[in-house]
Amino acid sequence: MALLEIAKKSLLAAEKYLALNSLISVQSQPELLSQVQASQERISADSGESKSSIDGQLIAVKDNICTTDFPTTCASKLLEQYVSPFDATVVRKAKEAGAVIMGKTNMDEFGMGSHSMYSHFGPVMQSAEDGRPARSAGGSSGGSAVAVATGMCYAALGTDTGGSVRLPAAYCGIVGFKPSYGMLSRWGVVAYANSLDTLYDAINGHDDNDPTSITPQTRERIQDRLSRSRRRGQRLAIGYPEEFNLVELDDPVRDAWENTLAHLNSQSHRIAPVSLPHTKHALSAYYVLAPAEASSNLAKYDGVRYGYRDPADRSQDGLLFSPTRANFGAEVRRRIIAGAYSLSSEAIDNYFLKAQSARRIIQRDFSNAFAQPNYLITDNLEEGRGKEGVDVLIAPCSLSKAPFLEDVKMQKSALDSYVNDVLTVPASLAGIPAICLPVMHGENDPVGIQVMAQYGDEETMWEVAKIIEEGLGSGVGSKTQPTNPTVN
């Protein structure tokens, strides 16, 4: 199908599903089609060369990633009119690869939420077809997930701090990918938690502007070590973390997990239980570390340096929130207060430093589980030889399928939503790559299953993900556009 025809179908989908509120801003149709036409003419020319696999494809961008063509609001009143003077590195690289940015997607304000409900522009929802109530799109990249699932775009960029790409992907029945921390540039991404935020082919690579970006020399060293010890085309060791087998798992989720492991076993791969004993502390550690970093990162939004300024703001001493900063949503204010407390002199030892310690132990648990060592922290090839361990870990992405939006709204406490991240947060704390795939469960909606691998070993992760998708993912995803990924 010609690129122009695909783009027109995507625009029709964007119009049809407007009520789902997945988009905050959209490129004008003439400008968008003009860019696609230019790509099509370039590819159809005598040389027939495209810039990349995404040349002429429509890409949506989460609204906490800076763009010069659209406002970057972070779904907050404070930044409602803010237009960045530069493109984020991932956006610039996507444009250089020929991608057409079709718009900015809705999200939880500043990335803080699990259902994309905490937005100044209203909640995101999944399509309520056949008279059924609307379901949650997940968060915080719910707008990106819905845009892909409904065929509004070829793929979408999101950010994954504690599962904010993988959880929406699981709920919406699409693919969501979080790379190893530092592999994609975070420059131009509005930070929630610097040490946890992550945003592949066209956009992968080092960026001098991002101090957390892995250098070319380190990337080369890691890939060289991995390639020399990787089991190419051989029987893989597939682990399932015992601590993820929670009593709260819904039966369809547990069944899909078991079916995935059974399918991999039928392909002659070895299945083994793995213990990650300290991941039970992951959720509580995350909700100390992330708000602490957020309280620091959001301090600049005071109406002077960045953001909307309330005329009533007199910067009165003693106010917890000035009138300007009171324009943060309730969930953002809640996390700022929690983060500020955990960094206070009376709490930092008991909360923040202990959470940092828990994070390091969780990273060690994951590193010890894999057959390959983490070559980011070791250069010793001998360390990986003969080591017992697995090549990847397989686990669910969520405790259940997407809940009904009304049920989420009726929760007595916002804290009830935090538990939704319990299965995605561990990989974020460890900084390892993880991909969520939709796996069919009988005649029902797909269930999100994640594949996790050692730091930098995206290749093995992709290999196993392909086996799962080919065997259990047939026909999943949107009726219009099955399994295009939302990457972070």
Curated annotation (Swiss-Prot):
Signal peptide: none annotated. One of its GO terms (cellular component) is glutamyl-tRNA(Gln) amidotransferase complex. Its EC number is 6.3.5.7. Its main location: mitochondrion. One of its GO terms (molecular function) is ATP binding. Keywords: ATP-binding, Ligase, Mitochondrion, Nucleotide-binding, Protein biosynthesis. Residues 218-227 have a biased composition (Basic and acidic residues). It is found in: Mitochondrion. Residues 205-228 are annotated as: Disordered. Pfam families: Amidase (PF01425). Transmembrane segments: none annotated. It catalyses: L-glutamyl-tRNA(Gln) + L-glutamine + ATP + H2O = L-glutaminyl-tRNA(Gln) + L-glutamate + ADP + phosphate + H(+). Allows the formation of correctly charged Gln-tRNA(Gln) through the transamidation of misacylated Glu-tRNA(Gln) in the mitochondria. The reaction takes place in the presence of glutamine and ATP through an activated gamma-phospho-Glu-tRNA(Gln). Subunit of the heterotrimeric GatCAB amidotransferase (AdT) complex, composed of A, B and C subunits. PANTHER family: GLUTAMYL-TRNA(GLN) AMIDOTRANSFERASE SUBUNIT A, MITOCHONDRIAL, TRANSAMIDASE. This is Glutamyl-tRNA(Gln) amidotransferase subunit A, mitochondrial.
